[in-house]
Amino acid sequence: MNRRKNLKVSIVMGSQSDFKTMKLAKEILLKLKVPCEVKIISAHRTPKRMYEYALKAEKNNIGVIIAGAGGSAHLPGMVAALTQIPVLGVPIESKKLKGLDSLLSIAQMPKGIPVGTLAVGEDGAINAALLAASIIANNNLLIKSKLKNWRASQTCLLYTSPSPRD
């Protein structure tokens, strides 16, 4: 098996408005020192760009793709159909259906084209970054250490926070 080194995470989203949610994924990845990039690629408005991006992702040293999409949310599934790289889908919360439409679109992929589907909105973006970091950490001891420390700090925050019963 040829293991690729120095893999990065690519965060893609269907529109600029999705960045409000997806920037949280970027912030987590930067805290963990995971190399990442951010791109706006629409499955509907820029399908040729999406196609080219997905086909070149492995050559561009992408190890995990986090794809955020709202509404019909085809971006994660279409990217997953075009690459062997793990794709994590983040449903973006919408005004009309609160992201339920996006969640169902991303989660209900046909067998053979998996998309790891996270929670709707900000929690999903954060967890997608942590999951992507975990995947990259399998071949990167520095990121593995950063992720371990991050999780330990989350535990410490819980124990040092004031009790609501006090």
Task: Describe each model-derived feature in a short phrase.
Residues 41-58:
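N-terminal beta-loop-helix "entrance" segment that forms/cooperates
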Residues 82-119, 144-146:
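Short, acidic/small-residue loops that bind anionic groups at enzyme active sites
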Residues 9-37, 42-43:
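Glycine-rich phosphate/diphosphate-binding loop of Rossmann-like nucleotide-binding domains
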Residues 53-91, 95:
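Glycine-rich phosphate-binding loop
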Residues 159-166:
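Conserved small/polar residues in nucleotide/adenosyl-binding loops
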Residues 121-155:
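A charged, well-structured terminal subsegment
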Residues 18-22, 47, 72-78, 97-100, ...:
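Short glycine/serine/threonine-rich phosphate/pyrophosphate-binding segments
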